[in-house]
Amino acid sequence: MELIKFPSKEWIHEFKNVVNNSVDYKEAAKWWEGDFLFVIEPDDKLDKKIVMYLDLWHGDCRSVDYFEEGDSLPETEFQYAGTYSNWLKVIEGALDPIKGILTRKFKLVGDKGKVMRATKAAKELV
């Protein structure tokens, strides 16, 4: 199976499929209501900012979208932002998404308390 390049339109759509087929995520996030912008900041391995949108609702990902630098972005309840290299660590399982916030490798904009109550869902999401 060919790996899908991160970040890309194909990747975020496949991510939606994986989330929607995860029984563990559905259980962990059955109460969650909120949308995110996942912001991938440039670093020495990525030369432009990429933003991916996720609409998460009661254990399902209802919609996703992909934006490049300069595109108009939707308003969301949350933004989770970090460098491309740190995003790869999260995707590969080398960095827990919540620990990423606590160690300032990622910045969370939005109700931090709500996200901290959803640590199991956050872990299942990645």
What are the residue ranges of the model-derived segments?
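Feature captures hydrophobic
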Residues: 1-126
